[in-house]
């Protein structure tokens, strides 16, 4: 039996990954992390979607320690969420949570070990993204190698969205006939607003711009998606 673990936040990207994983694996587990994020709503959305889409199990892990160490506008109410074009002096937006994906992928791999899953799937992307260093392909591959050495099991990190732009990610949801669900029922917004979100933060900007690009030229974007992924 082929099993996979999806790192699941209930947002557009991880939900699209879950939708695809359910088509590609016999058994799919979701793991969501409670790190004291600004909006608890994303945990509730993740729980609802994992059940609605048919995941085998949904594991919620308390990683509150990350909140103590990683100061970010996603973990502190007194730090405002910036507009999409705002950056800090180091080039990173205040929404960057240092070490988040290091911790999440490591814990997801441990969970995968326990449920005998062969893959950990994460929705990180290096094409249309906010510049987070722990979303880069080289980081994921390096951590994957370290994890395999550390647990002596060939657990594979899969990043199906890594080289897709946001329009192609929308096309992927549409390919599986779930575009409406992803648009209406996921929570990507940094201000915690479900669906189309606040329309002002970086996450909402990337999401809305990608959807608009897809809707303007569906055939071309879908063709590009299929060329990149090998879908038929």
Swiss-Prot record:
SUPFAM superfamilies in the cross-refs: Adenine nucleotide alpha hydrolases-like
InterPro entries, per database record: QueC, Rossmann-like_a/b/a_fold
Entries under CDD domains matching the protein: QueC-like
Example of a GO MF term: ligase activity, forming carbon-nitrogen bonds
UniProt-annotated binding residues for Zn(2+): 189, 198, 201, 204
Known pathway: Purine metabolism; 7-cyano-7-deazaguanine biosynthesis
GO biological process, one term: queuosine biosynthetic process
Reaction(s) this enzyme catalyzes, per UniProt: 7-carboxy-7-deazaguanine + NH4(+) + ATP = 7-cyano-7-deazaguanine + ADP + phosphate + H2O + H(+)
Binding site for ATP: 8-18
Keyword Mitochondrion: no
Alphabetical UniProt keywords: ATP-binding, Ligase, Metal-binding, Nucleotide-binding, Queuosine biosynthesis, Zinc
Pfam families linked: QueC
Documented EC number(s): 6.3.4.20
Textual note on the cofactor: Binds 1 zinc ion per subunit.
Highest taxon in the source lineage: Bacteria
Cofactor or coenzyme needed: Zn(2+)
Classification via PANTHER family: 7-CYANO-7-DEAZAGUANINE SYNTHASE
Function: Catalyzes the ATP-dependent conversion of 7-carboxy-7-deazaguanine (CDG) to 7-cyano-7-deazaguanine (preQ(0)).
NCBIfam families: 7-cyano-7-deazaguanine synthase QueC, PRK11106.1
Family listed: Belongs to the QueC family.
Protein name: 7-cyano-7-deazaguanine synthase
Organism: Serratia proteamaculans (strain 568)
Name of the gene this protein is made from: queC
């Amino acid at each position: 039996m082929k099993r996979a673990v999806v790192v699941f936040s209930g947002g557009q990207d991880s939900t699209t990954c879950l939708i695809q994983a359910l088509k590609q694996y016999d058994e799919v587990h979701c793991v969501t992390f409670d790190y004291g994020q600004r909006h608890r709503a994303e945990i509730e959305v993740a729980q609802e979607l994992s059940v609605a889409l048919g995941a085998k199990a949904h594991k919620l892990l308390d990683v509150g320690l990350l909140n103590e160490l990683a100061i970010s506008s996603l973990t502190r109410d007194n730090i405002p969420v910036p507009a999409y074009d705002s950056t800090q002096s180091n080039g990173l937006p205040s929404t960057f949570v240092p070490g988040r994906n290091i911790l999440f992928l490591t814990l997801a791999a441990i969970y995968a070990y326990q449920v005998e899953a062969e893959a950990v799937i994460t929705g990180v992307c290096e094409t249309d993204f906010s510049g987070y260093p722990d979303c880069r392909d080289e980081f994921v591959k390096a951590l994957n190698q370290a994890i395999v050495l550390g647990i002596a099991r060939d657990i594979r990190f899969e990043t199906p969205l890594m080289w897709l732009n946001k329009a192609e990610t929308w096309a992927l949801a549409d390919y599986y006939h779930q575009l409406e669900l992803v648009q209406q029922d996921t929570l990507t917004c940094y201000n915690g607003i479900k669906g189309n979100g606040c329309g002002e933060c970086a996450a909402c900007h990337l999401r809305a711009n990608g959807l608009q690009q897809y809707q303007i030229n569906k055939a071309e974007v879908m063709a590009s998606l299929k060329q990149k992924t090998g879908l038929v």
